[in-house]
Design a protein with these regions (language model features):
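The beta1-alpha1 cofactor-binding region of Rossmann-like NAD(H)/NADP(H)-dependent oxidoreductases
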Residues: 45-55, 87
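SDR active-site lid
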Residues: 158-180
Length: 180
């Protein structure tokens, strides 16, 4: 299978990319940083920039002719009281956690629709199910993604494309270090 995973520079994304690569799948990791691995190919991509997203998908399709799985893993956290959050930090968070994920899903759908197969997995959070204190905007960004995924699931099922959210708990990765 051809698998695209976003946010592969560290943590969950890197671990998934290595795992699937070791299993013999063709894995493309999209992240802002260029990561060296013998198990997957990195395409430096900022998923908040739709031009970069489209270029990465085109590059993959030139060599593989298909995309079987997209794992939308790229994301960031945000800590602080709602009242103390700045507009800039909120927009940065939603631009990555929601808009970037939507751009990725939109970019792979033409290929998945044409081949009448695909799986899109969005890494979400148990925080999407409730407003976590001092992580309200993070919870909101993941909740918004979940609702988009829920709608898209019904929009694309006719092409045998499955879309879901994976609700993870707190995992010790570098996302905690990079929270705004």
């Amino acid at each position: 299978m051809t698998i695209i995973i976003t946010g592969t520079s560290t943590g969950i994304g890197f671990t998934l990319a290595e795992y699937f690569g070791k299993k013999g799948h063709k894995v493309f990791g999209l992240s802002r940083k260029n990561v060296e691995s013998q198990y997957f190919t990195t395409i430096p991509t900022d998923i908040t920039d739709n031009t970069q997203v489209q270029a990465a998908i085109s590059e993959i399709l030139k060599t593989e002719n298909r995309i079987d799985v997209l794992i939308n893993n790229a994301g960031m956290g945000m800590v602080g009281a709602v009242e103390d959050s700045t507009k800039e930090d909120i927009l940065k968070l939603f631009n990555l956690n929601l808009v970037g994920a939507v751009q990725m899903m939109s970019a792979v759908m033409p290929n998945m629709r044409e081949q009448k197969f695909g799986k899109i997995i969005n890494v979400s959070s148990i925080g999407s199910e409730m407003g976590l204190p001092f992580r309200g905007f993070y919870s909101a960004s993941k909740s918004a993604l979940d609702k988009v995924v829920e709608a898209m699931r019904y929009e694309v099922y006719q092409w045998n494309v499955e879309v879901c959210s994976l609700h993870l708990g707190d995992i010790k990765t570098k996302i905690a270090e990079n929270r705004v």
